[in-house]
């Protein structure tokens, strides 16, 4: 089998797919790309068994056929070429591959394509369509808040809930939570599932803003298709926590401030915070927000005062600065509102601008303990959203 392909075009497609290939594959053949030629169109497949990604490219071929080629050596070679045609000759008996360029020849060992895992197919699936920029925005708003705890796999992805009224994306790691919804993306069926982190990362890196994305799903898999790309992923099995139960409904204390002003201040003050807790303290009184941090081990301390708009009683509350910085970096608004009720209850961050019609984002961050408040009020404290361990769906009352 012989085929000719443009080096730049091939490299562009392989780099898209390379993110799927795992550094610790259980099957050696998964270190390869699957090339399948049919009528001068070559489909390229990469898989790690959980996520499968496919692309296609035009070639000049003397016959149909398929082969798997080692990913790393092929990409490393293609990176060194200028834009030129490359000729591949495949020995269908030994699976040896000879690649020819304008400057020379390169031999590498392929593997039998029949040994490559079968591409998953979706049976009894439903589908919906959304704009690429809508999906990318939803991923950017939520993915950072997902967890990495192997004991709670349902929290390591993004929960997606589709209905006839809206589509909602939710992510949490038990310390922070993000809920992002769109009323302009709907489904005929009411369904929910948990999308893994890896395919979502690949999606946001490859979807163009002007692309239309088709999402197909059933009980075990989800399929995303756009342009010449198809991504199939296995859904995370399990029941997602009742996230609505942890969102405080009564938040009488409301602070309004410019996102960039608050973000810059927190970044500076957090440098002086304890390196384990990353604790910063908000003290709000009148139209002034005081942000402080302290590291007693090294006698470090910082304080800044910012002007803000505030409605409510004077209060103090502690937060993990890393969580707040993550949220402000991803909220996509110039002005935000922080809604609070008490030092031992979650704070809510809401964007006040930058939202499209039908788009809503809510970010929740759990407080960290302020010793003086809890000693004075004789209160217990937990910085976790979840009440208990492995697959619990119960939230704390606060």
What are these regions (language model features)?
Residues 1-389, 394:
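Structural preference for solvent-exposed beta-strand-turn elements
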């Amino acid at each position: 089998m012989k085929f000719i392909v443009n080096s730049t075009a091939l490299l562009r497609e392989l780099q898209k797919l390379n993110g799927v290939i795992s550094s610790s594959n259980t099957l050696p053949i998964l270190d390869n790309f699957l090339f399948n030629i049919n009528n001068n169109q070559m489909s390229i497949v990469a898989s790690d068994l959980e996520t499968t990604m496919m692309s296609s490219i035009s070639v000049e071929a003397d016959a149909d056929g398929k082969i798997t080629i080692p990913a790393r050596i092929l990409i490393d070679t293609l990176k060194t070429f200028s834009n030129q045609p490359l000729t591949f000759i495949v020995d269908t008996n030994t699976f040896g591959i000879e690649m020819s360029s304008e400057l020379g020849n390169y031999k590498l060992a392929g593997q039998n394509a029949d040994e490559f895992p079968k591409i998953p197919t979706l049976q009894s699936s439903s589908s919906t369509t959304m704009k690429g920029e809508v999906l990318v925005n939803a991923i950017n708003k939520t993915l950072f808040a997902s967890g990495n705890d192997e004991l709670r796999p349902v929290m390591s992805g993004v929960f997606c809930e589709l209905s006839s009224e809206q589509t909602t994306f939710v992510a949490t790691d038990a310390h922070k939570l993000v809920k992002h919804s769109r009323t302009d993306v709907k489904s005929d069926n009411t369904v929910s599932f948990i999308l893994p982190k890896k395919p979502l990362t690949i999606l946001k890196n490859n979807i163009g803003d002007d692309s239309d994305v088709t999402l197909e799903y059933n009980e075990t898999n989800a399929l995303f298709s756009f342009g010449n790309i198809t991504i199939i992923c296995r859904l995370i099995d399990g029941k997602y926590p009742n996230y609505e139960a942890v969102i405080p409904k009564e938040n009488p204390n409301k602070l309004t401030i410019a996102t960039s002003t608050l973000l810059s201040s927190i970044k500076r003050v957090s440098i002086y915070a304890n390196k384990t807790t990353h604790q910063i303290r908000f003290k709000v009184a009148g139209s002034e927000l005081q942000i402080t941090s302290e590291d007693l081990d090294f006698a470090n301390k910082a304080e800044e005062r910012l002007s803000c708009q505030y409605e409510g009683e004077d209060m103090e509350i502690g937060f993990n600065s890393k969580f707040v910085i993550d949220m402000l970096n991803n909220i996509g608004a110039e002005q935000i509102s922080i809604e609070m009720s008490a030092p031992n209850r979650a704070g809510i961050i809401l964007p006040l601008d930058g939202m499209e019609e039908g788009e809503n984002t809510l970010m929740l961050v759990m407080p960290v303990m302020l010793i003086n408040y809890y000693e004075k009020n004789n209160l217990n404290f937990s910085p976790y959203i979840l009440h208990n361990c492995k697959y619990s769906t119960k939230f704390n009352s606060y």
